[in-house]
From Swiss-Prot:
InterPro entries: AP2/ERF_dom (IPR001471), AP2/ERF_dom_sf (IPR036955), DNA-bd_dom_sf (IPR016177), ERF_plant (IPR044808). It is found in: Nucleus. The keyword DNA-binding applies. This is Ethylene-responsive transcription factor 5. Belongs to the ethylene-response factor family. Class 3 subfamily. The AP2/ERF domain binds specifically to the 5'-GCCGCC-3' motif. The affinity of this binding is higher if the seventh amino-acid of this domain is basic. Transcription factor that binds to the GCC-box pathogenesis-related promoter element. Involved in the regulation of gene expression by stress factors and by components of stress signal transduction pathways. Probably acts as a transcriptional activator. One of its GO terms (molecular function) is DNA-binding transcription factor activity.
Length: 282
């Protein structure tokens, strides 16, 4: 026998199911107006898990009027064929289906993605204009139209005439050339472009003077030697000359013996005076 608590719980479940299902009540109330309704349900799903599990709740309703009490067994046998086909329907998961359909529709109705190309960053090249450097003017230096630099200096020994020193690639080189020339001409009184480099100019000037002095000494020696050679040559030439015979009486004998005596009178006149140039023989 089942306990009264279990019976009450089963009755509550059956009552809730019957009250919710209006179609089931309309079908069975017409046949059992004055009879006692006994409902029994067996779950097919519970039979697969637990074969022996089944419940047969009974509900006896007393009718007041015309019908008599019917036995439970006769009612169950009559309605067994109808109850066998009855099964609880499973409620489909509407939320999952809706979500999947919404996903599909939203994916289909979704607008195609736009391919937006990122523009390439353009590097702006800024032209930096350098400020023109101040051109320093050097003493004795002039710039030619084609870019070269010319160096000139005035020679005080020649009444200030310009002396050409040459052309240079840079103004500094031309200025140094002017400083060298100014130091050579004026010495320590010269006004130069680079005063700190005067000591270098002194050394260069001294190195240039030494070979000049040596060369001058060599030239003096060479001239002395040449003069001595000339004197010696003249002396040798005089010695090599044949001495002439003097006009003495001893030398006259040879002349008389050799000829008719006319050779002596063919001697040119020795007097510087023209009046006595000719000798008259008497």
């Amino acid at each position: 026998m089942a306990s009264p608590q279990e019976n009450s719980t089963t009755l509550d479940l059956i009552r809730q199911h019957l009250l919710d299902d209006n179609v089931f009540l309309e079908h069975y109330c017409s046949e059992t107006e004055t009879t006692t309704l006994i409902y029994s349900q067996s779950s097919s799903s519970s039979e697969s898990l637990d074969q022996s599990f089944s419940f047969e709740p009974t509900l006896n309703y007393a009718t007041t009027a015309q019908s008599s009490n019917l036995e439970v067994s006769t009612f169950f046998n009559n309605s067994k064929t109808e109850f066998d086909s009855f099964e609880f329907g499973t409620i489909p998961n509407v939320s999952a289906a809706r979500s999947s359909s919404l996903k599909q529709t939203s994916f289909k109705e979704r607008k195609p993605s736009l391919n937006i190309a990122i523009p390439v960053k353009q590097e702006v090249v800024q032209k930096v204009e350098l400020a023109p450097t101040e051109k320093k003017h050097y003493r004795g230096v002039r710039q030619r139209p084609w870019g070269k630099f010319a160096a000139e200096i005035r020679d005080p020994n020649r009444k200030g005439t310009r002396v050409w020193l040459g052309t240079f690639d840079t103004a500094i080189e031309a200025a140094k050339a002017y400083d060298r020339a100014a130091y050579k001409l004026r010495g320590s009184k010269a006004i130069v472009n680079f005063p700190l480099e005067v000591a270098n100019f002194k050394q260069e000037f001294n190195n240039e003077i030494r070979p000049l002095v040596n060369s001058s000494r060599k030239r003096v020696r060479e001239t002395v030697n040449e003069e001595q050679l000339v004197i010696n040559k003249e002396m040798k030439i005089e010695e090599e000359r044949v001495p002439t015979a003097p006009l003495t009486p001893s030398s006259w004998s040879a002349i008389w013996d050799s000829g008719d005596g006319k050779g002596i009178f063919e001697v040119p006149p020795l007097s510087p005076f023209g009046a006595y140039s000719q000798l008259v023989m008497i």
